[in-house]
């Protein structure tokens, strides 16, 4: 059972009955692919919950469930308990009408790229229209492959120090979830 985060949508018109349209947080699916360390799953769950998101999908996690995930989740054990494990990214995103992927690496292939703030505004607008979206995060040590990125409509990049632009997966999730929360207020 997923709980709903109900927020007034600043991008949407009022409903016909003059009530405000709302965002349902269960329309935002955070997808972790091939996560190596279970503690990162717990940290991502915590990052999500602090920003009002609770829908977590795991594609081929190395170890899950795990005491390490629980230990690093803080009070976000409900997010872990409700997480769904999938065998493929396609299966995890099949309900989504729009998919975003994250990457810190330069690519030879060009994808439509947005920063976290732009993506969050776009995500929020889509969820106000009852569109389910997914945000895919890759394996800690290598990110997503080009084939995995091909499953996304847009790529999210978080600007960072060019000498060391790699963020931990939970940090990346926290930034994007924060931007979504910010876009909703």
Task: Give the predicted meaning of each segment.
Residues 10, 14-185:
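Post-transcriptional modification and biogenesis factors for structured RNAs
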Residues 1-7, 16:
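Histidine-centered nuclease catalytic patch
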């Amino acid at each position: 059972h997923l709980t709903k985060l109900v927020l007034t949508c600043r991008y949407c018109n009022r409903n016909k009955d003059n009530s405000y349209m709302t965002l349902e947080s269960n329309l935002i699916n955070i997808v972790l692919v091939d996560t190596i360390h279970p503690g990162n799953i717990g940290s991502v769950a915590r990052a999500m919950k602090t920003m009002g998101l609770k829908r977590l999908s795991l594609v081929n996690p190395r170890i899950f469930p795990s005491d390490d995930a629980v230990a690093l989740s803080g009070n976000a054990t409900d997010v872990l308990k409700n997480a769904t494990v999938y065998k493929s990214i396609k299966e995890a995103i099949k309900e989504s009408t729009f998919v975003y992927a994250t990457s810190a690496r330069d690519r030879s292939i060009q994808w439509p790229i947005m920063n976290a703030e732009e993506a969050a505004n776009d995500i929020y607008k889509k969820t106000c229209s009852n569109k389910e979206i997914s945000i895919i995060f890759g394996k800690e040590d290598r990110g997503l492959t080009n084939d995995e990125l091909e499953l996304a409509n847009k790529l999210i990049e978080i600007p960072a120090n060019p000498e060391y632009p790699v963020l931990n997966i939970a940090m990346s999730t926290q930034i994007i979830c924060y931007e979504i929360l910010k876009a909703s207020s």
